[in-house]
Amino acid sequence: MATSSLSTIVFSPLALSNSSSFPNKPQVSNLSLHSSLSNLRRTLSHSSPSSSSSSNVRVFAAPEVLESQETGPESYVEEGSETSALGIGADSDQMAPKQKIRIKLRSYWVPLIEDSCKQIMDAARTTNAKTMGPVPLPTKKRIFCVLKSPHVHKDARFHFEIRTHQRLIDILYPTAQTIDSLMQLDLPAGVDVEVKL
C-alpha cells in the first residue's frame, strides 16, 4: 500500500494530459526537481503526521561540486540541519591524536606513585605536550591465608594482603623534547613503569 501510493506521488507529474483521474493535468515541460520534491514532502506530511520526522530527504555532494556550483532557485536545501557532512570529517582529526604515549605506573606504596606521577606530568608540561591524567586505576589486592600453628589448630590463621596501586597517564602530541625529558627522569625504585607508544 505504501509503495504504490509513493510511486503514484512520485510519478503523478508524468501522467498523461487526457487522463481524468488527475484534475491538475501538469505539463511535462514544467517538471523540476524542486517542485517534485516539495510536492512529495507536502503529500507525505499530510498523509501521516507521525512519520513526517522520518521522511527527511538529505542531499550530499562532493566538496568540488559544492565549490563550483552556486545556489540557484531550483536547488533544494533542507531546513533545520545545521551540521555539515564536511565538518564532521574535519573534527575526527582533532578528536583522535596521531601519536600518544601511555604510561602505566604500579607501586605498593601510594606516596611513591604520586611523586612519580608529579614528576612525569611536570616533564610533559614543560615541553608543551598535552597530558591526560593521572587516572587512578582499581587497586589490586592479593590476599594470602597462612596457618598460625605449624601443625594443628586450623581455626587460627593469619591473613596477609598485598595492595598494588596503579595510575595511568596519557601524553598526547609528544615531541622529541618530551621523550628526551621523560628519559632523563629518575623515578624511585619501588615504582614499576610501563610505557606504550
Curated annotation (Swiss-Prot):
Signal peptide: none annotated. Keywords: Chloroplast, Plastid, Ribonucleoprotein, Ribosomal protein, Transit peptide. One of its GO terms (biological process) is translation. The keyword Cell division does not apply. Residues 1-60 form a transit peptide. Residues 67-91 are annotated as: Disordered. GO terms for molecular function: RNA binding; structural constituent of ribosome. GO terms for cellular component: chloroplast; ribonucleoprotein complex; ribosome. It is found in: Plastid, Chloroplast. The keyword Ribosomal protein applies. InterPro entries: Ribosomal_uS10 (IPR001848), Ribosomal_uS10_CS (IPR018268), Ribosomal_uS10_dom (IPR027486), Ribosomal_uS10_dom_sf (IPR036838). It comes from the Eukaryota. Belongs to the universal ribosomal protein uS10 family. Part of the 30S ribosomal subunit. This is Small ribosomal subunit protein uS10c. It comes from Mesembryanthemum crystallinum. The gene is RPS10.
